[in-house]
Amino acid sequence: MASSNLLSLALFLVLLTHANSASQTFFSFDRFNETNLILQGDASVSSSGQLRLTNVNSNGEPTVGSLGRAFYSAPIQIWDYTTGNVASFDTNFTFNILVPNNAGPADGLAFALVPVGSQPKDKGGFLGLFDGSNSNFHTVAVEFDTLYNKDWDPRERHIGIDVNSIKSIKTTPWDFVNGENAEVHITYESSTKLLVASLVYPSLKTSFTVSDTVDLKSVLPEWVSVGFSATTGITKGNVETNDILSWSFASKLSDGTTSEGLNLANLVLNQIL
C-alpha cells in the first residue's frame, strides 16, 4: 500500500510539474468588444467591431487633440521575481491610419507594455505614454510616428522602440501610406532580450523592420497591461484616425519549477524501487 501511495505521489508530481512549468497567455480578436478591454480617454469600439483609439466627429472625421488608450483586460506577467525568468511574447495586429484630404498626419499610435493601472500621459507627440518630465514610466513601446517633433524625433516618419522615454532608442524610416491597412508583427525573445518589430503593407508589398535589445526586467514591473495608445495633432491641420482592426497576443513565462519537480519525483521513485 505504501509503495502504491508513493507511486501515485510520484506520478502526481510529474503531472504537476508539467502543468505548472510555464505561465502562458493567448488571445485573439478579429472583432473587438468592450468586455475584453480597458478603454481610456477617447478610445471606443465602433459598431463594426474596430478599436477606434482616437475620436472622430459625426461625419467620421478625426478631431484635434484626441488621446485614447486600450489595453487587454487581464494583467500579463512579464517576469517572475522569485525565479528571475522573463517572458517571451509574440503579437500581431492590423491598423489603419486615415488622414483627411485637407490635413497632414499626426501624431501616431503605439503598441505598449505599461504598469497595471497606468493612466494616460500627455497628448500630441507624447502619444499618451510619456510626458516632458524625467519620471520613470516603467513603459516599453513600439511607436508608429507620423509627425516629426524636433525635440526628440528623427526628421522622417518612423517606427521606433521606446524605453521609458518618447525619444526612441532605435528607429527606422517608415513610408507611411494614407488609408492602407498595415500589418504588424512584434516579437520579444527573453533569452536574447531582442525586440523586433516589422510592418508590412500587403497591398504594396513594402516592409519596414526595427530591432534592439531591451532588458524588460530592468524596465517593467512583474505584471503589465498590454495594448495600444494613440493621439491626434494639437492643431487643426494635423489629424488622423487611429484604428486597430485585429489583434492577437501570446506570451510564455517559464516558472523554473520543471527540474525541481522532476528531481523530487525521481527521489520518490527511487524510494519505491
Swiss-Prot record:
InterPro entries: ConA-like_dom_sf, L-lectin, Lectin_LegA_CS, Lectin_legB_Mn/Ca_BS, Legume_lectin_dom, Leguminous_Lectin. Keywords: Glycoprotein, Lectin, Signal. SUPFAM superfamilies: Concanavalin A-like lectins/glucanases (SSF49899). Residues 1-21 form the signal peptide. The keyword Cell division does not apply. Glycans are attached at residues 33, 92. GO terms for molecular function: carbohydrate binding. PROSITE patterns: LECTIN_LEGUME_ALPHA (PS00308), LECTIN_LEGUME_BETA (PS00307). Belongs to the leguminous lectin family. This is Leucoagglutinating phytohemagglutinin. It comes from Phaseolus vulgaris. The lineage of its organism: Eukaryota, Viridiplantae, Streptophyta, Embryophyta, Tracheophyta.
